[in-house]
């Protein structure tokens, strides 16, 4: 028997609602804010139970990748059908394509808060 259920993934950021909106739009999910929340927490939720959470951090500093001055501690990989089309779409949402591209079957981007994430063909 499992001790726990699927964990939520929580990303630190300066603006939880803005980053939840970015990921919810990219994944075609819904943004959920708690009624008693003061804006320091937001969630992007799918219809089938998956969730990304976003927590406000005062004086947030984005990770520096691929360097290690402020290393990333995790990153998200999302599967897409077409790297060019998906890349253009996430840039339109506010992402930035990273200058360092170490592979051919994925592309590295930075979300609006500076977290690295990858668009992957599989």
Model-derived regions, located:
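Short, low-complexity, polar/charged sequence segments that are solvent-exposed and flexible
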Residues: 71-75, 96-98, 117-118
